[in-house]
Amino acid sequence: MYAATLAVVADWARALELPVALLQPRSADAHETPLNVRMVRMALGARAVIAVGGGLEGYLPALERALQGKTPIRTLLDHLRPTPDDLHIWLDLVYARQSCEQILRWAAQDGLLGLAQRQAWRRTELLFRQLAVRMREARTTLQGKAYLAVHDAYRPLTQQLGMRSLGSLQPDHERPPSLQAFRDALARARRARVAMVLCADESPLGATAARLLRVPLVLADTLEMPDPQRDYFTRMAGLIDALQRAV
């Protein structure tokens, strides 16, 4: 069994018919998960820990010390080409597909690549192709549209859609923006003829900005929080559709 640091990584492993457990607690997002005893125990019982790396999971150095070499930690970022400039690799279909391919290579090294996994990879390839079709269709309506986000984790996707990011209303998760910074962001958005405001959850800050700018507020899933009801491919399709519906 593998241990995945993030829900999206666990979804990829499950799509490939590989046994996997999720370290990330349901209530914590990808950046804010603190290391706890449950996570260490789960990792100790795994064949390997599969992580994004690059500092995304801030607890990885502490987990590595706790494991004392008993379970290897494998990071996807070390195998993605070209090297991503944004850690939200799951929102880029090219990097997401490369990640699945790397997980399969690790499975082969571990003796876990059988007929079921090869068949699962063919199904997974089809799911990626279907998402790519959705992307091309969405790009025809979204290309050139500007957006403002409460916290802009969307750029790996929005860049592929040809959208223009106007930055984050709240770059720091922990601190709300100053009133002047908020006004400056709104002024910048008006000059750019912003089309929408994006937020991952019900955000008073995002709602206020959307109301003042008179544009739609889009609840746009960053896929950072686990969702037991929907897998990676369903959530990505939903995110693309949510952006497209806003224009």
Language model segments and positions:
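Extracytoplasmic metal-acquisition and chelation regions
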Residues: M1-V247
